[in-house]
Amino acid sequence: MSPSAVSATPPQAVVQGNPDLSADAVKAKLASNGQPTLAALDASKLTRTRTTTPRTVPALDDPIRNVSSFATDHMVTCTWNVNTGWATPELKPYGPFSIMPTASVLHYATECFEGLKAYRGYDGKLRLFRPDCNARRLLMSSARIALPTFDTAEVEKLIKELVAVDGAKFLPKSDAGKFLYLRPTLIGTQAELGVQTPKEAMLFIIATYMPELSETPGGMKLLASQNDTVRAWPGGFGFAKVGANYGPSLMAQQEARRLGYNQVLWLLGDEAQVTEAGASNFFTVMRSKEGKMQLITAPLGDKVILDGVTRRSVIQLVKERLTGSKELEPIEVVERQYTMGEIVEASEEGRLIECFACGTAFFVAPVSKIHFRGVDIDVPMAQGEIGDYTNTIKIWLVDIMYGREDHPWGVVVEEKEV
């Protein structure tokens, strides 16, 4: 079987009873069962239909750029059927598509998605940041909710194609330091009620403008969740990027904003384990009682938090560049369960150094305050608006994303001039 061939085995059979839901593991299981193959997702077959009603690019100061509703001229779509596999992918004008009211996604949350950005570099080039990681995570999420599998390299190619076509117009070279937000999404479209594995699905990829969310004046203020409000739990699906993780969190988020906070700091269990901040991963810099500087974040092993691409990158860069640093005090990366009690104690003892949230949307956002059980915990920020470690990490990532540093994570897209 070729690497891109897709087995007829339904995805739920692949993942049931298997704790290893990595993209590689899913593909290996699919490729080894000897079942007949269906048509694979194949980006080389992409058809292209250019829009006849091109949109006007909004000015840099146009408020429409500060919401995520203004999309570029085109989108990529591809349908899937259990009997035939993947159809021919299409690049076509952005606009509505039709699904039936009985479509699986509308009733049973058979939906997963990714979020990544296309960056206009200071050298004039268009880049993606580690798109292979996003494609692999989309595959993992798809398998978790019994949607079809695919070769991740083909999804990556389709993402690049959309950026290549629309990037030059909507992210011109004059917009150095700006970005477009990309949203690959996979939905179950079978038009039949009933809790069952969808026999039809659709992949689509769109690009929109998005506001800069990492520069909250004074730092982000977080409201710690209550014991009776849980975002994710061991054995659940908090590790997968599925829509069902986000809708149920909106009520708590709305309450946090009503009270003057930016996001919810999601806790778990009676011990108030720290997990995520809003829809972002969360890091704490604190000095241990033994005097060692540590960068602490929740682990992936219990599958409560998302394996964020930014999170993964932060950990890798810190291990490579800060464990023996001369510019900043060397710091140890620690992935473990930790609690709000530890943060409170560190704050009281002067050992709490910094906190930050990170993800594609919020990038690297410093945290200045956490409200926990009636008490405001002030988080130090050495430079007034951002801490030293947070700032250093943010600069490293910006340099890679926008081409100031030549790095394999910054993937150049050969754009098609308009």
Regions found by a protein language model. Name each.
Residues 2-263, 267-273, 316-418:
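Conserved alpha/beta cores of soluble small-molecule-handling proteins
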Residues 311-314:
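Nucleic-acid-processing active sites and adjacent nucleic-acid-binding tracks
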Residues 273-305:
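Glycine- and Gly-Pro-enriched alpha-helical subdomains that act as flexible
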Residues 260, 307-309:
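A short glycine-leucine-enriched loop at secondary-structure breakpoints
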